[in-house]
Amino acid sequence: MKKLAIIIPAYKPRFLRETLDSIAKQNNHDFTVYIGDDASPYQLETIVDQYKNKFDIIYHRFEQNMGKKDLPGHWERCILLSEEEFIWLFSDDDLMPFDGVARVIQALQKHSGGKYIFRFPLEVVDEYGKL
């Protein structure tokens, strides 16, 4: 079993491909990505299928949309799909640096043995790809 679950609650396809591209470039592949499709009207599975040979990825389509009225509930049901020791809650419009997984696993192992919530530095990129 992999060490890290990367949980991606998903609804819109707009940035999902870029998100998955950034995950595919990781220098540490000790992770499984879980895509929780929040009953999207878009064909998210078609995008996800393009990454099945690049890293471990599991797609699950939920029949009921929860994000509009209970976003934490949607996150929770996505988390319940995973079995890994550590969980990284990601978004379908987030980008990961090439060493993101390695840095997260290193931080989590350094502070193991308790319950922690980590927040890592981020850079905001607009819809045009500018910081």
Task: Indicate residue ranges for each PLM-predicted region.
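Acidic donor-binding/catalytic loop of UDP-sugar-dependent glycosyltransferases
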Residues: 43, 94-107
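Short, well-formed alpha-helical segments that are part of the catalytic scaffolds
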Residues: 12-25
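Cell-envelope/extracellular polymer assembly enzymes that use nucleotide-activated donors
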Residues: 3-7, 32
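Short aromatic/hydrophobic "clamp" motif used to bind/position activated sugar donors
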Residues: 87
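Acidic donor-binding segment of Leloir-type glycosyltransferases
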Residues: 24-64
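Active-site acidic Asp-centered loop
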Residues: 38, 90-92
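Conserved donor NDP-sugar-binding/catalytic core segment of glycosyltransferases
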Residues: 101-131
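Glycine-rich, basic loop-to-helix element that forms the pyrophosphate-binding segment
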Residues: 63-82
